[in-house]
Amino acid sequence: MAGNTFGRALRLTTFGESHGPGLGGIIDGCPAGLELTEAHIQAELDRRKPGQGPTATKRKEADTVRLLSGVFEGCTTGTPIAFFIANEDQRSRDYGNLAEAFRPGHADWAYFQKYNGLRDHRGGGRSSGRETAARVAGGVIAKKILARRGVTILGGCVELGGIAAPLWGLDMDGAAARPYCAAAPSVVSQWDALVAEARKAGETLGGIVRIEAHNVPAGLGEPVFDKLDAVLAHAVMSVGAVKGVEVGEGFAAAALRGSQNNDPLLPADAPEPGRARFASNHAGGILGGISSGQDIVLRVAVKPIASIAVTQKTVDRQGQPVDILIGGRHDLSAIPRIVPVLEAMTALALADALLLQQRMGLGL
């Protein structure tokens, strides 16, 4: 299967399936000398792991990571970094009835068509959201590369099931500690009621996640086919539940006039050649596909989980109509577990762009 590797200077390859022995990845291109331990990776994996929070699946996975190579005495060596995360609580018997039928909203039908009728029906196999654990592990390394330049990445949920957090009340710094990774504390009680209602109805919920990257240096990204916003969109759209991404004002910019959407440049506090500041950030930190030095701001649309506790119509392998009720243990929403995944993919894209810029000898 092609398409398992992301990046050019910093490359992450992931492997594994939802109900196989485990999953993992290899990071190639990481500089030597970064402090890295299993505990560093585990802290981020614990944010994503199943079995915690009001919307999470009841599947219990420790998601304990093992570093297999590329690290010596707590530091990266510059060689490929391999890691592995065992699957410990898979229940494949829950999926026996899905060997012959295709689940609506899942990748079952598309995989069946692409791979000549061969697919792992147990929990979706390679298409399962469980694959994203390896992305989170790789993202830890990318975040460490960025931290050397003072770059930080924050994520938080700004909308769940159509109920949006007030833009004026966002507190991204505290999002990770709140239920749903909520970017505003005022909306949590409304989301609690919505989740209870959806659970009673056997339904699932989608939402919108906001990602911010702070202290990103100006000059990252390439001017044509590898624009930084295009690479970031590629990164986050590769996550299975993601259906859309906005940079800065995004689709709202279509309703603005140029005078409203432009970000005026102002002299820096201490004016000098090559320095300026902006009066606003409608562009989301990217101009002409290249970082401007402002915060990069993304809004990511996350679809409802396709596994619902409601009988659905579908067809079997012979094309005959059947009704299915999906068993197993499933999230009520990809939120909040998807937040560290989106942070990781943003970090991988930015770290890759940073290393490419350095490789080209263009400063930074």
Curated annotation (Swiss-Prot):
GO terms for molecular function: chorismate synthase activity; FMN binding. Pfam families: Chorismate_synt (PF01264). It catalyses: 5-O-(1-carboxyvinyl)-3-phosphoshikimate = chorismate + phosphate. InterPro entries: Chorismate_synth (IPR000453), Chorismate_synth_AroC_sf (IPR035904), Chorismate_synthase_CS (IPR020541). Keywords: Amino-acid biosynthesis, Aromatic amino acid biosynthesis, FAD, Flavoprotein, FMN, Lyase, NADP. The keyword Acetylation does not apply. It is an enzyme of class 4 (lyase). Its EC number is 4.2.3.5. Reduced FMN (FMNH(2)). Pathway: Metabolic intermediate biosynthesis; chorismate biosynthesis; chorismate from D-erythrose 4-phosphate and phosphoenolpyruvate: step 7/7. GO terms for cellular component: cytosol. HAMAP family: Chorismate_synth. Belongs to the chorismate synthase family. This is Chorismate synthase. It comes from Desulfovibrio desulfuricans (strain ATCC 27774 / DSM 6949 / MB). The lineage of its organism: Bacteria, Pseudomonadati, Thermodesulfobacteriota, Desulfovibrionia, Desulfovibrionales. The gene is aroC.
